[in-house]
From Swiss-Prot:
The gene is IRS2. CDD domains: PH_IRS (cd01257), PTB_IRS (cd01204). The modification Phosphothreonine is found at T350, T520, T527, T579, T580, T779, T1082, T1159. One of its GO terms (cellular component) is plasma membrane. This is Insulin receptor substrate 2. The modification Omega-N-methylarginine is found at R412. It comes from Homo sapiens (Human). The keyword Magnesium does not apply. Residues 53-66, 1188-1198, 1224-1236 have a biased composition (Gly residues). A motif (YXXM motif 2) lies at residues 598-601. Residues 1-12, 459-471, 859-870, 1013-1022, 1083-1093, 1263-1277 have a biased composition (Pro residues).
Length: 1338
């Protein structure tokens, strides 16, 4: 406002002598005070005249009259000139344009009175404090009178609440009541009264430079903010919340403020220069005092719970504790930006009719309106922010901080009378104290508050007439007071910007019972829950962040379609702590001003219908709630499909509690489980994990298949849906394979649990991180899939822990069903799985036939129980593999994935991050069966790399396809970082075994010609009576690498039905290290060990470590035996170390030890000198040894043969067993009752290195006599060791299955002989005779 024009020439002097201290004897009736004061800058005395509003004073009269003049301060050169009216005043300062009037002091003057206008700063110095006070009081009184005369504020507001003057027009037309705090706001008008104002010069340093805040500004301090008002500007350029100030200080004449990240400017410092050091110190002290006062105010009530904001300029704040107030009209966040709701303790204010329905009155406490003591009239209750009405009570009244009474909006403009609360109450904030539940209060029609205060979207009144409020504090039973909030705060710099209840609730909001809601967000558990009456299964007022109770395991759903359009707007919403009446809520009206700016985040689900695990009510401190639709759009976040409010909606939350399995109730009710339980420990028994696949072909194979099969139940008793969301269940027992929006994380694109309709993953938005399937069907490996009932009902088992995190993402060239299988499955590249190869070409026998064929005998239950690590292979319908050409179980090693050590169940540890090379494939194959060279899988030659990939490997994401088909020619990603150990024994099959049951050497079991990707080895002379018709070629030198023949030769040499095109692409083998251990008919040779004296080998720092030696006399399967040894605490897994010699390729990270010997590593932590952190398996060594009476053949010397063919077959000696001794840790996992010690990470040598371990379970089959192995039949018959082939490599779950018909060495033939699987893979090396395993004790 411009200064008034200078007056005309003064009239003649009155002749009265000057009266410096009593100036009012002047004839000028408008003069309030006059006297001599000094100017600040130079100290010159001038005669000052303070005039009130009038017609221009005597000067105007003398000049013939003029327009009315505002209050002003004039000064003349002397009193004589003023009295003589000899000239115009030297200067006139209009008081109505002053930002503030303050008492000041500087280095020169102790008693200053400073006037700050928008364009200048003017200060005068009094002689003493009394004179200063007199002038200051006169100035401030005049300002207050002018404000009252202008009608800008009620006269009662005139006295200043602090030392700052209440200036006219402070509220710019607000109807609020007063005090200096009326004007506290994020964006305060220039006419607002500030507590303190200083003129400072912002320096181009820190934020001043980055935010272009330089030059002369007014530093304006209010109760909660400081603003920088540039000269000639009406509004502050920057307003900082006092709560955002990290620290402040002054040095000399400089004052600086450091603000945090929540400030509008961002973090940084603002440096400003005051007139002198005294002013700088005064600024510092004053701001510190204001900050302390604010801190003390909010210490009474935690910041995180203060939830309200006075609505804009319409709500005066009469409590000094208020954080801030908004002074702009309510703008949507799209215009004002995301700003945090302010916390205000405003008494009552009513939004003017002009604000219409988009303004909402907010109370200081959201959902917590306590009645002030003075307001506790009969039934009178202050309204809480979201309208949670609370019964007033003496207990709550003293603590009440909700003094804003929500008045009518929407043009009704019914003003709410100010609540005459005591001063103490005005400063108090309501704590969360128990209050009696009372009926909802009526809201003035049309204003429901968004608890954020960012936008004032409000619901219009429900249709129909709305009677006026009979009393400002009285509300009808059907309505609930709403809180209107101003969304003018333009920045998230509001103090308490990160309060907890910003994001949905105060800490105790939701702690009510199911179907109950605490009316007060701040009352923890003491507040009686309000029964939600007509919510239709919705709980109003608070969003439950808990997972809904679900009966069908379908816990969470996506946003319902009707709310999809509001999603984008909902994203702007920062806080979801919405509160609405528990009874009725006004009908939403999309046309309300800022309703479209928000979406209603609804968590609707009825009762426990959305409960994920009805039997686990204690999974969260919070239980079921009902949604609180407020002024947001309609995002349904938790509506169960069976929910009465929104069916088919999907809540976007996932259960994070371990062990909460999705209860399966069919695919119809649980179709879109988008999220997965993340608990690795909720693992079913291994039999659940190892369920055989249930495919359409298998279902067709068994005529008795019926749709009425029982739902699968895990060992834990959980049932699993046949369909579910797309996130994978990290725990083997939990998942819903039905894809709904996200790509499946387990191995095939089409899960077996999905129905035979072949529904593939609909979208490729997320990459399938599971091993890609080897077959086009895309069904996951067996241990992921469901088992098939003999009746043909595919068990809808839940996929187990799939290998979703391999060391590197190998882009498989072949994607199953369109899935982008980006991770390689560590499948055995050396051949098909034993059982699959035998059974694949075979017709599906009856359940009993399958059981007997697997050696389980009639004792095998018809229901194919999921195999435990040593389950008999009976009970698996052979048609599974025969018709689908798939491996039974992936031959992979996922050291982190599937818990498979039965005795490790008590020690589930989270998987460590993988490093390349942590997957080791150990293939115990007999060259006499199908491997052209004794150890073909050695990837020494790039040309042989593709041949090594077993097409039958079920989960080979390397691109292997169905065996016998051209899909085998797919290129595969390089098998880098992996190590393949092939224990190929040239030993011939043992005579005496029925031709239909090839038992004995692994390769005989693993390599029927029809299915083997490798051609049978050429016959070689063998003096052994047990030599096969097709003797294998001479074994290689131990540790010597073999190169496969060209793929064409391999394919040509293969028998009928073999894979016709093993891809001959010489893909990069990367760092895949193959260790072939060709065990000749001679005594065992050291694996991958150069000639070294036995003493040198044994004499290592790891003395006392037991070495597991594979003897040549036994076939690969029989090489490992299990005896009933007592537990050995030091029996830890041994890291397999690849020998760098022989052309083996090692990963650059030296995943495997570079030692030239397979040095055993002591399980003691002190004895692991050669351990590498990335090693995953500990030393398993084939030792050359003549112990046990084993004869030494030509190749049995210390010096390994120089050529793979150099070894001549030696007559195998009679197997001589070496009894296990208690100190011999041959098997890490003992059978139940066999005294095997559990493998523990604590006892493992690599425990401190974060290694994953493999338990090598050496099992004994004393009842099974050696049986000769006939030539591989076209249709191999299952044998005793039939299922061992699936575990010949350290696959993802290496559990040796298939015990002889006469009883297993561990647990008997029945399934589930071992305890449930746990987090570590176990290798069960079953063997017939204990004598055939040699354990060298150092």
């Amino acid at each position: 406002m411009a200064s008034p024009p200078r007056h005309g020439p003064p009239g003649p002097a009155s002749g009265d002598g000057p009266n410096l201290n009593n100036n009012n004897n002047n004839n000028n009736h408008s003069v309030r005070k006059c006297g001599y004061l000094r100017k600040q800058k130079h100290g010159h005395k001038r005669f000052f005249v303070l005039r009130g509003p009038g017609a221009g004073g005597d000067e105007a009269t003398a000049g013939g009259g003029s327009a009315p003049q505002p209050p002003r301060l004039e000064y003349y050169e002397s009193e004589k000139k003023w009295r003589s009216k000899a000239g115009a005043p030297k200067r006139v300062i209009a008081l109505d344009c002053c930002l503030n009037i303050n008492k000041r002091a500087d280095a020169k003057h102790k008693y200053l009175i400073a006037l700050y206008t928008k364009d200048e700063y003017f200060a005068v110095a009094a002689e003493n404090e009394q004179e200063q006070e007199g002038w200051y009081r006169a100035l401030t009184d005049l300002v207050s009178e002018g404000r009252a005369a202008a009608g800008d504020a009620p006269p009662a507001a005139a006295p200043a609440a602090s030392c700052s003057a209440s200036l006219p027009g402070a509220l710019g037309g607000s109807a609020g009541a007063a005090g200096a705090e009326d004007s506290y706001g994020l964006v305060a008008p220039a006419t607002a009264a500030y507590r303190e104002v200083w003129q400072v010069n912002l320096k181009p340093k820190g934020l001043g430079q980055s935010k272009n805040l330089t030059g002369v500004y007014r530093l304006c301090l209010s109760a909660r903010t400081i603003g920088f008002v540039k000269l000639n500007c009406e509004q502050p350029s920057v307003t900082l919340q006092l709560m955002n100030i990290r620290r402040c200080g002054h040095s000399d004449s400089f004052f600086f403020i450091e603000v945090g990240r929540s400030a509008v400017t961002g973090p940084g410092e603002l440096w400003m220069q005051a007139d002198d050091s005294v002013v700088a110190q005064n600024i510092h002290e004053t701001i510190l005092e204001a900050m302390k006062a604010l801190k003390e105010l909010f210490e009474f009530r935690p910041r995180s719970k203060s939830q309200s904001s006075g609505s804009s300029a319409t709500h005066p704040i009469s409590v000094p504790g208020a954080r801030r107030h908004h002074h702009l009209v309510n703008l949507p966040p799209s215009q004002t930006g995301l700003v945090r709701r302010s916390r205000t303790d405003s008494l009552a204010a009513t939004p003017p009719a002009a604000k219409c329905s988009s303004c909402r009155v907010r109370t200081a406490s959201e959902g917590d309106g306590g009645a002030a003591a003075g307001a506790a009239a009969a039934g009178a209750r202050p309204v809480s922010v979201a309208g949670s009405p609370l019964s007033p009570g003496p207990v709550r009244a003293p603590l009440s901080r909700s003094h804003t009474l929500s008045g009518g909006c929407g043009g009704r403009g019914s003003k709410v009378a100010l609540l005459p609360a005591g001063g103490a109450l005005q400063h108090s904030r309501s704590m969360s104290m128990p209050v009696a539940h009372s009926p909802p209060a009526a809201t003035s029609p049309g204003s429901l508050s968004s608890s954020s205060g960012h936008g004032s979207g409000s619901y219009p009144p429900p249709p129909g007439p709305h009677p006026p409020l009979p009393h400002p504090l009285h509300h009808g039973p059907g309505q609930r007071p709403s809180s209107g909030s101003a969304s003018a705060s333009g920045s998230p710099s509001d103090p308490g910007f990160m309060s907890l209840d910003e994001y949905g609730s105060s800490p105790g909001d939701l702690r009510a019972f199911c179907s109950h809601r605490s009316n007060t967000p701040e009352s923890i558990a003491e507040t009686p829950p309000a029964r939600d009456g007509g919510g239709g299964g919705e709980f109003y007022g608070y969003m439950t962040m808990d997972r809904p109770l679900s009966h069908c395991g379908r816990s969470y759903r996506r946003v319902s379609g009707d709310a999809a359009q509001d999603l984008d707007r909902g994203l702007r919403k920062r806080t979801y702590s919405l509160t609405t009446p528990a009874r009725q809520r006004p009908v939403p009206q999309p046309s309300s001003a800022s309703l479209d700016e928000y979406t209603l985040m609804r968590a609707t689900f009825s009762g426990s219908a959305g409960r994920l695990c009805p039997s686990c009510p204690a999974s969260s401190p919070k239980v079921a709630y009902h949604p609180y639709p407020e002024d947001y759009g309609d995002i349904e976040i938790g509506s169960h499909r069976s929910s009465s409010s929104n069916l088919g909606a999907d809540d976007g939350y996932m259960p994070m509690t371990p062990g909460a399995a999705l209860a399966g109730s069919g695919s119809g009710s649980c179709r879109s489980d988008d999220y997965m339980p993340m608990s690795p420990a909720s693992v079913s028994a291994p039999k659940q994990i190892l369920q055989p696949r249930a495919a359409a072909a298998a279902a067709a194979a068994v005529p008795s298949a019926g749709p009425a099969g029982p739902a699968p139940t895990s060992a834990a008793g959980r049932t699993f849906p046949a369909s579910g969301g797309g996130y994978k269940a990290s725990s083997p027992a939990e998942s819903s394979p039905e894809d709904s929006g996200y790509m499946r994380m387990w191995c095939g694109s089409k899960l077996s649990m999905e129905h035979a309709d072949g529904k593939l993953l609909p979208n490729g938005d997320y990459l399938n991180v599971s091993p890609s399937d080897a077959v086009t069907t895309g069904t996951p490996p067996d241990f992921f899939s469901a088992a098939l009932h003999p009746g043909g009902e595919p068990l809808r088992g839940v996929p187990g822990c799939c290998y979703s995190s391999l060391p590197r993402s190998y882009k498989a060239p072949y994607t199953c069903g369109g899935d982008s299988d980006q991770y390689v499955l560590m499948s055995s590249p050396v051949g098909r799985i034993l059982e699959e190869e035998r059974l694949e070409p075979q017709a599906t026998p009856g359940p009993s036939q399958a059981a007997s064929a697997f050696g389980a005998g009639p004792t095998q239950p018809p229901h194919p129980v999921v195999p435990s690590p040593v389950r008999p292979s009976g009970g698996r319908p052979e048609g599974f593999l025969g018709q689908r050409g798939r491996a039974v179980r992936p031959t992979r090693l996922s050291l982190e994935g599937l818990p498979s050590l039965p005795s490790m169940h008590e020690y589930p540890l989270p998987p460590e991050p993988k490093s390349p090379g942590e997957y080791i494939n150990i293939d115990f194959g007999e060259p006499g069966a199908r491997l052209s060279p004794p150890a073909p899988p050695l990837l020494a030659s790039a040309a042989s790399s593709s041949s090594l990939l077993s097409a039958s490997s079920p989960a080979s994401s390397l691109g292997s396809g169905t065996p016998g088909t051209s899909s085998d020619s797919r290129q595969r990603s390089p098998l880098s970082d992996y190590m393949n150990l092939d224990f190929s024994s040239p030993k011939s099959p043992k005579p005496g075994a029925p031709s239909g049951h090839p038992v004995g050497s692994l390769d005989g079991l693993l390599s029927p010609e029809a299915s083997s990707p490798y051609p049978p080895l050429p016959p070689r002379p063998s003096a052994s009576p047990s030599s096969s018709l097709q003797p294998p070629p001479p074994p290689p030198a131990p540790g010597e690498l073999y190169r496969l023949p060209p793929a064409s030769a391999v394919a040509t040499a293969q028998g009928p039905g073999a894979a016709s095109s093993l891809s001959s692409d010489t893909g990069d083998n990367g760092d895949y290290t193959e260790m072939a251990f060709g065990v000749a008919a001679t005594p065992p040779q050291p694996i991958a060990a150069p000639p070294k004296p036995e003493a040198a080998r044994v004499a290592s720092p790891t003395s006392g470590v037991k070495r597991l030696s594979l003897m040549e006399q036994v076939s690969g399967v029989e090489a490992f035996l299990q005896a009933s040894q007592p537990p050995d605490p030091h029996r830890g897994a041994k890291v397999i170390r690849a020998d760098p010699q022989g052309g083996r390729r090692r990963h650059s990270s030296e995943t495997f030890s570079s030692t030239t010997t397979v040095t055993p590593v002591s399980p003691s932590f002190a004895h692991n000198p050669k351990r590498h952190n990335s090693a995953s398996v500990e030393n398993v060594s084939l030792r050359k040894s003549s112990e046990g009476g084993v004869g030494v053949g030509p190749g049995g010397g210390d010096e390994p043969p120089t050529s793979p063919r150099q070894l001549q077959p030696a007559p195998p000696l009679a197997p001589q067993g070496r009894p296990w001794t208690p100190g011999q840790p041959g098997g890490l996992v003992g059978c139940p009752g066999s005294g095997g010690s559990p493998m523990r990470r604590e006892t493992s040598a690599g425990f401190q290195n974060g290694l994953n371990y493999i338990a090598i379970d050496v099992r004994e089959e004393p009842g099974l006599p050696p049986q000769p192995q006939p030539p591989p039949p076209p249709l191999p018959q299952p044998g005793d060791k039939s299922s061992w082939g699936r575990t010949r490599s350290l696959g993802g779950l290496i559990s040796a299955v298939g015990v002889g018909s006469t009883g297993g060495g561990c647990g008997g033939p029945g399934p589930g002989a071992l305890p449930p699987a746990n987090t570590y893979a176990s290798i069960d090396f079953l063997s017939h005779h204990l004598k055939e395993a040699t354990i060298v004790k150092e």
